[in-house]
Amino acid sequence: IDMQDTNKYKVYKAITAVGKWLLFAIVSFLILFPVLWIFVSSITPPGELFKMPIDYIPDHPTLESYKFLIENVGLLEKIGNTVLIVGVTIVVSTVICAMAAYGFSRFRTKGISIAFAFIIATMLIPEVVTARPLYDFMRAVGLYDTYPGLIILYISAVIPFTVLILKNFASEIPISLEEAATIDGANFVQRLFKVVLPLMKPAIATVCIINFITCLNNFFTPLYYSNNIQVLSVAIVQLPLRDNMYGVPWDLVSAMGWIILLPIIIFVAVFEKQIMDGIMAGGVKA
């Protein structure tokens, strides 16, 4: 009987392992196939895109789509705009939110708790709800279609999540470390910059990475609040048609989509551990 039970357990374990790997393979295929197909479409000549039967590997791969984007769509300018706006957003939002997170984690009064709750609650408000009032406000104060205006909107979009993660992480830092620094003669600023912030580096790195991805994927803000300042996320809907070509230029759409996806894929692949560790550490305590 013991031998039979052992054999049954081995069979069950083998079936479970096969099932897990099969499920993993199916999910991976469903996720990766569209990404790979975008890349294949981007290097496929327009005349071969809709050829039947479908060629999953193009007969005549070409980089003409990327060349066309660089020469005719101002791709380098869009990349520059994206780097400027996203870079300033990450730096400014991280500094502001790190200061705010420290205050929320250390000064526990009713008013501060209410302010924190209001900030987090804004994560639940859809962008379309505030679109028209913000649009009118941006035009009234002269910030519509300007770099400062877009940067302010980008910063406001990432503040709630950043404050939440950093505040929860800061709450886990023992106050005794600051008390020891105070005994050694450190003032408030020294405690903040020499004790607390260095310990928050994992969480700060995490929110910087996630905010980079969030800003890079932000489609609504640059589309609605800007006309002349173009970034990568909206470039895909502003692609011109080639000469004597009607309909959607799918090869250009695929090339632009791949250009947008590539830095995100690289960032997630390189910083996967930091992202997960930071989120887990920042989500321990609300």
Show which residues each predicted segment covers:
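A structural signal for multi-pass alpha-helical bundles of membrane permease subunits
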Residues: K8-Y12, T16-A286
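Short, Lys/Arg-enriched N-terminal segments with co-localized hydrophobic residues
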Residues: I1-D2
